[in-house]
Amino acid sequence: MYWEKALSEAERALAILPPSPKVSEFQNIRSLFPYIHTPSPLQEVSTEIQLNKIGAQLFILEDLTGSGKTESALTLAKRLMSSGRANGIFYALPTMATANAMYSRLVDVLSKLYLPGSKPSLILAHSRSRLMEGFTSKIWDNLLKGSSEFNNETPVYAGCASWFAESSKKALLADVGVGTIDQALMGVLQFRHNNLRLLGLEKKVFIVDEVHAYDAYM
């Protein structure tokens, strides 16, 4: 009885979600960030560094404040996605305030990661995400599929289906996410449904920002 009920609920959940977005080809850093006219040395490296053909990769980006580390990290992420090594991003930060600020920045980049016409989901993942109006205003209602709002006749781009936002354990399943580092760490700790978090991180570029500030939060 439970299995049949779970199957029907899973089908209903999948019917709500838009199809998986297709990643676009990487062109150059200005295609992601038009305001960059002269890339910094770190940003140039992010567009040129060789990617391994197989296996996981670790990149450590360290530079002065204002050197464009965020743009460099997202450029590398875009290159990894375009080469077929990933299909999404999770951007981890130490605090809810820094995650909120990064969410606003990712809204502008999201459409440039995927092909035109795609509807990738962007989630803000932390325990107080519902208090950020910039996020809650972009949550698609479960009944919106096929409606004028979902179909972009009313602009709600760079949002996510409410199914993702109902629970933090499902948040990492969105195509692109930004949140506090604990949302990812709970995937490897003894929390309920930790395997669901790991599934959400699979095939994603995992960016850890502000590393120097994590001691107080881990």
At which residue positions do the language-model features occur?
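N-terminal helicase ATP-binding lobe
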Residues: 1-218
